[in-house]
């Protein structure tokens, strides 16, 4: 019998991490796309790093950052009352770390491709940077941002290595669908693995279809984000 907990956990983790990625990633993307500052290349490289490093390496970094003996880990435990590692919240952190760089890269491309005349007109009318971002930039790039969000959700949904390192593979607690498929294959439960694979594949197709739909720019031709 198939245990559907890993699927629901994966969907919850992906949804929460995507919202957090939007809150963090849009500002970083806007900063990189429109401002020059010292160490910009270093920040850009740091954003790209999670896209190229092995997941186990990223997971190790997160263990160092959020382990019980680390300052961040101690602060989290003091606030929440329990350690972060080997909890479902750790799976959110893993997914966030995995998905945010993709969202930043996609959002930055959307911001850089925006016709600068709109921004100049808004500034000439006295719009602040805050108002410019919310009232001009986001509405004009909303479809690209939604497409990037869908791709970030899909990336978070399929994370394996980072989640395994920091959240573990605890059935009923931290086992996501990717980990459940691995366990099913390892234990010889082919039917369970096949069912989960088919379900997650359907979910992925739906997400990618949404991403491709929103990638249609209202000011230009359809462009696929993938």
Question: Which residues does each PLM region occupy?
Answer:
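C-terminal transmembrane helix and the adjacent membrane-cytosol boundary/short C-terminal tail
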Residues: 39, 101, 106-127, 194-226
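Membrane-interfacial helix termini and adjacent extracytoplasmic/periplasmic loops
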Residues: 59-96, 167-170
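Membrane-helix interface segments
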Residues: 35-43, 71-72, 87, 117, ...
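Non-cytoplasmic
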Residues: 67-70, 145-183
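Transmembrane-helix boundary motif in ABC transporter permease subunits
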Residues: 16-47, 60-62, 110-112, 116-118, ...
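Periplasmic/extracellular loop-to-transmembrane helix junction in inner-membrane transport proteins
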Residues: 1-19, 31-39, 78-81, 184-191
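Transmembrane alpha-helices
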Residues: 19, 97, 104-107, 111, ...
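Interhelical loop and adjacent transmembrane-helix boundary motif
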Residues: 1-5, 166-205
């Amino acid at each position: 019998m198939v245990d559907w907990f890993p699927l629901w956990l994966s969907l919850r983790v992906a949804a929460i991490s995507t919202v957090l990625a939007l809150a963090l990633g849009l500002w970083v993307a806007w900063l990189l796309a429109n401002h020059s500052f010292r160490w910009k290349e270093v920040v850009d490289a740091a954003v790209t790093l999670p896209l190229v490093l092995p997941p186990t390496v990223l997971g190790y970094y997160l263990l160092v950052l959020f382990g019980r003996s680390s300052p961040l880990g101690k602060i989290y435990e003091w606030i929440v009352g329990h350690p972060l590692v080997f909890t479902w919240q750790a799976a959110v952190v893993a997914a966030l770390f995995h998905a945010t760089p993709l969202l930043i890269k996609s959002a930055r491309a959307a911001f850089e491709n925006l016709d600068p005349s709109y921004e100049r007109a808004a500034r000439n009318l006295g719009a602040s940077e805050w108002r410019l971002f919310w009232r001009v930039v986001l509405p004009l790039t909303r479809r690209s941002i939604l497409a990037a969000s869908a791709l970030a959700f899909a990336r978070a949904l399929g994370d394996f290595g980072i989640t395994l390192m920091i959240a573990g593979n605890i059935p009923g607690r931290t086992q996501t669908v990717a980990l459940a498929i691995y366990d099913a294959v390892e234990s010889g439960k082919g039917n369970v693995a096949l069912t989960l694979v088919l379900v997650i594949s359907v979910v992925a197709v739906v997400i990618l279809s949404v991403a491709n739909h929103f990638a249609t720019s209202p000011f230009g031709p359809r462009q696929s984000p993938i």
